């Protein structure tokens, strides 16, 4: 084995796309492996880049255990959870393309989380009926708010993600918002009125856009089409039929 071959096995070449003043700037970075067989996660690469070559590199991370979702970035154009996504030779790390970029790999997330503010009820009384929730309900509550599901979502694509716009929330919905609404529908302590309100909110956010959509993909594997979108569409049709 030559010295060059050994050196190549000790490093990994990646592109990190920084962002400033509305412009992207691709930067080549050579990640130094801790050992020859290491398969570094994207977050490992970003942290080392910040410690060595790019001290001002901005990115988000939290739990480092795929529990919080804030570290999500695009890897080769697809959303990935940085703390649990292996990086390979010549991969490109970039801010999520589905949300406004603030700087480098940091995107504005609050317009998603604020979308349902004041529009859905918050259950604070506990489960006084001692009713067990379904397995599907518990699966939906495992959402980590990574927003990977926004990728290729025709409903979310109706929103403008121009960073110069200061809207508090988006007009049209997305799989995450629909998941939150379907969680209310499936909550055993929700009243019929609360469930109907949640379904109506889904319709108002543009649920009809989902009719011709092949389905959305969750960053942690929740069946969004089968357990969120399709049930909401069925429920909305039932409500519409009852009104006429």
Explain the meaning of each model-derived region:
Residues 40-52, 96-244:
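Ferredoxin-type iron-sulfur electron-transfer modules in oxidoreductases and energy-metabolism complexes
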Residues 2-109, 150, 154, 159:
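Iron-sulfur-associated redox domains of electron-transfer enzymes in respiratory
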